[in-house]
Regions:
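Thr-Gly-centered strand-to-loop micro-motif
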Residues: 60-61, 91, 135-136, 155-158, ...
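C-terminal amphipathic helix plus adjacent low-complexity
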Residues: 196-256
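Short, conserved active-site loop motifs that form the nucleotide-linked donor/cofactor pocket
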Residues: 28, 113-115, 177
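Membrane-proximal helix-turn-helix segments that form the acceptor-binding/catalytic region
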Residues: 1-3
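A donor-sugar binding/catalytic signature common to diverse glycosyltransferases
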Residues: 121-165
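Donor-nucleotide binding loops and adjacent catalytic segments primarily
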Residues: 8, 12, 18-19, 33-132
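Nucleotide-sugar donor-binding patch of glycosyltransferase catalytic domains
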Residues: 151-207
Length: 256
């Protein structure tokens, strides 16, 4: 058995702090992140883009199940700062509560510089065309941000799991993304994060450094390394089967 971790230890090390035997460490390989591509036929024409040929900021929570706080924070920034220079396109995701989708859509309908969709079957094209991305930092979205080299503002969840926060914190330290933590931006007695903090970050986002400006060896080599590891494992399997007198189909071979 082997353990393959689809990332890099300098970005996120899920084994850190675990008292694991050396045998486990020797079986562990970090592959790098999985490079994504826009699917054939999914490239967006200007007429199909949310704002035509105008740049936009993509706001996505992936599946969307716990994206309420992030969506509300970004939306309040646009509601209170009508001079935001770049419009926003919200993709709520299939798992955001339908009542919340309706509430957000009603607020968005009152704004000229915000549009939304519940879900799109080709989110890669929308992300690749965006001037910047606001996201929670789940694994799949991070792979898309890195693959399409988009300036990104990550708003990670901190409860009940810290996975997104830990990944985003380290990526910010490395200069790959910027991060805003809602709990750190709360003002007064309100638990809501300050819309002005978000509005400032949104204004700066399109001019933010893109991830490729930071050299991280092997960052997006995941698919290549997985293929290599599969070939190695298959070679071991074939060698093992040969030793017990079987060919690659598992049939018994004759011996004299």
């Amino acid at each position: 058995d082997e353990i393959w971790i689809y990332g890099l230890p300098q970005v996120s090390n899920p084994l850190e702090g675990l008292d694991l035997p050396g045998a486990i460490a020797r079986k562990t390989s970090y592959t790098g992140y999985l490079r994504r591509a826009v699917r054939n036929g999914a490239a967006t024409l200007d007429a199909d883009k949310p704002f035509g040929d105008q740049p936009y900021i993509m706001v996505t929570a992936g599946g969307g199940g716990d994206g309420e706080l992030m969506f509300d924070w970004v939306l309040r920034a646009y509601e209170n700062d009508s001079a935001q220079p770049v419009p926003a396109f919200f993709m709520f995701g299939p798992f955001l509560d339908p009542d919340l989708v309706s509430q957000f859509a009603a607020r968005i309908a009152r704004l000229d510089n915000v549009e939304s969709v519940t879900f799109d079957t080709h989110p890669e094209a929308l992300i690749s065309d965006a001037a910047g991305v606001v996201a929670m930092g789940g694994y799949n979205t991070v792979c898309e941000i890195l693959s399409f080299d988009r300036p990104a503002l990550i708003v990670p969840r901190t409860k009940p799991r810290l996975e997104q926060f830990l990944r985003a914190s380290r990526m910010q330290e490395m200069g790959l993304v910027k991060m805003l933590v809602p709990e750190e931006a709360a003002v007064g007695e309100s638990s809501l994060p300050d819309w002005k903090v978000m509005a400032t970050a949104l204004r700066h986002l399109p001019q933010q450094r893109v991830p490729s400006k930071v050299v991280v060896p092997g960052l997006l080599d995941g698919l290549r390394n997985v293929n290599r590891l599969v070939e190695i494992a298959a070679g071991r399997r074939r060698a093992s089967m040969h030793l017990v007198g079987r060919d690659t189909t598992g049939q018994q071979t004759g011996h004299s």
